């Protein structure tokens, strides 16, 4: 399957082939060394003093050692992620923080072993309200700035019925943005019980908290119990410890699911205290109690057109811990799946939001404190992944914070050939509020070309009016030996708030060379 398909390649069975002359490394080799060398030229006009065509060269080392009984130890020195693809831009029309997925290889490996709470991932654009105790992007990144990773180690694997994950990272300081050298530690342990169930614990430690007043620790326990064929019960309890943030420094959740092919029900009770502060995790919102229920009915009509007809009715009710209503949503979804693999979504939402403080939704557009009720219709058509042109197109229309909102979206993939594809993504919001009118535009274009089974070229261009930015990211990768790579990366960011050609903010050119040695 060509690398240009990305994750969608998992579902492209028609493009699969037969492996011949496959060379497998000897399983007796327990030690892998991967040194790297990198040279770069960078310009950054947002720094003081301005950095212009600054040349740098350095190296580092990754080590992997396969221990007996299914455990793996990883060590990293002077870790570098220059070859990682840039984050996809997002538009935020809520008062809560956005979450960006992890893309760095070191943290992606074994990521599932450390999951607790959350998940932080998005489902069809709907963010989870559950906090994540460990969110790896809190290590080595601060407000978009890279922090040096000096040294790190990780232990992962299974010992009988136990799944083990331990991580320790020492980061350097970044005096220009006021970040101190910090040690991050995470320990995660799960045990299998019954047939398909687990119980576990987690602990995290940050040697210097964000306020610089001491340390930050988090301790928690969770369970996932599976009964019968579709019934499951999950839950967690977790508490943080930060100087000056005592009191409601806890979070807990209980969730019941019974999701069959025809009928389904979900119920969740979630609490996050106002002082809960996992500084190696991610919290979208604090000081709330959530009760959520969803009913699902999915018949399979005996018609030549429709494969199944999904009906979902959900109710989301969120209050502060003192009982004041903050958010409420009634949602109904009708989603027929057609025999050709296409889907059509038609969704009705009735929402209520209470703003406890004024909210600046856009530049010079501030929503006053108070209650806001709204209704909206969402319609989207999803083309099946087997089509040369696939993806989905969506439309939203309805009331919004005392005004109106109209949105159109297209996220797609155009397969020009088995080795060449283009992925356009367009999102435009027209917002009309009593406090002002504005239009938010997000345009992303991705180009992927598979040169050979061991090399590819990709380009990403993004334009976002919300952040007044235009950015590009161009990457070339050549795997000249199994596990050994050459990367060439060019990145550029420009500001678009002034008329005329976008003003250069930063630019970088990187060449990175890695060599895998097995013993």
Please report, for each region that a protein language model flagged, where it lies by residue:
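Outer-membrane beta-barrel channel domains
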Residues: 1-24, 29-43, 51-307, 348-354, ...
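Short, surface-exposed beta-strand/loop "edge" segments at domain boundaries and coil↔beta transitions
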Residues: 44-45, 321
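Membrane-interacting alpha-helical segments
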Residues: 46-47, 432
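Exposed, low-structure sequence patches enriched in small/polar residues
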Residues: 148, 236-519
């Amino acid at each position: 399957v060509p690398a240009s398909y990305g994750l969608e390649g998992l579902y492209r069975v028609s493009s699969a082939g037969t492996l011949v002359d496959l060379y497998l490394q000897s399983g007796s080799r327990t030690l892998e060394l991967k040194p790297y060398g990198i040279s770069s030229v960078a310009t950054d006009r947002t720094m003081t003093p301005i950095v212009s065509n600054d040349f740098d060269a350095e190296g580092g080392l990754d080590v992997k050692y396969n221990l007996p009984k299914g455990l793996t130890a990883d060590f990293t020195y002077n870790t570098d992620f220059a070859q990682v693809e840039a984050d996809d831009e997002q538009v935020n029309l809520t008062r809560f923080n956005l979450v960006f997925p992890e893309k760095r290889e070191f943290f992606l490996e074994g990521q599932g072993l450390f999951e607790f709470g959350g998940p932080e991932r998005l489902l069809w654009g709907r963010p989870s309200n559950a906090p994540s105790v460990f969110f790896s992007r809190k290590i080595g990144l601060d407000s978009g700035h890279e922090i040096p990773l000096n040294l790190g180690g990780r232990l992962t694997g299974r010992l009988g019925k136990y799944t083990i994950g331990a991580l320790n990272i020492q980061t350097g300081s970044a005096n220009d943005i006021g970040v101190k050298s910090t040690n991050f530690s995470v320990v995660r342990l799960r045990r299998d019980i019954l047939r398909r169930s687990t119980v576990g614990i987690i602990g995290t430690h940050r040697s210097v908290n964000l306020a610089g007043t001491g340390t930050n620790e988090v301790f928690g326990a969770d369970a996932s119990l599976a009964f019968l064929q579709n019934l499951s019960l999950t839950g967690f309890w977790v508490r943080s410890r930060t100087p000056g943030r005592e009191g409601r420094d806890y979070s807990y959740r209980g969730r019941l699911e019974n999701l069959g092919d025809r009928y389904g029900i979900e119920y969740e009770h979630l609490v996050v205290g106002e002082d809960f502060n996992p500084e190696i995790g991610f919290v979208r919102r604090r000081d709330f109690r959530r009760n959520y229920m969803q009913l699902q009915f999915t018949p399979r009509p005996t018609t030549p057109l429709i494969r199944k007809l999904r009906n979902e009715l959900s109710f989301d009710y969120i209050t502060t811990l003192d009982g004041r209503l903050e958010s409420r949503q009634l949602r109904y979804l009708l989603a027929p799946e057609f025999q050709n693999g296409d889907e059509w979504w038609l969704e009705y939402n009735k929402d209520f939001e209470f703003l406890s403080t004024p909210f600046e939704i856009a530049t010079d557009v501030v929503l006053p404190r108070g209650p806001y009720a709204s209704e909206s219709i969402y319609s989207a058509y999803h083309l099946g992944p087997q089509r040369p042109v696939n993806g989905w197109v969506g439309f939203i229309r309805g009331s919004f914070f005392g005004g109106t909102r109209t949105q159109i979206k297209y996220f797609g993939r155009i397969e020009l050939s088995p080795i060449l594809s283009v992925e356009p993504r367009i999102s435009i919001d027209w917002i009309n509020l009593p406090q002002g009118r504005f239009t938010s535009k997000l345009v992303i274009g991705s180009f992927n070309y598979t040169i050979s089974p061991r090399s590819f070229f990709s380009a990403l261009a993004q334009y976002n009016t919300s952040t007044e930015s235009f950015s590009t990211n161009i990457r070339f990768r050549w795997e000249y030996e199994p596990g050994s790579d050459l990367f060439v990366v060019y990145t550029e960011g420009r500001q678009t708030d002034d008329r005329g050609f976008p003003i250069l903010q930063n630019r970088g050119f990187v060449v990175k060379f890695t060599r895998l040695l097995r013993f």
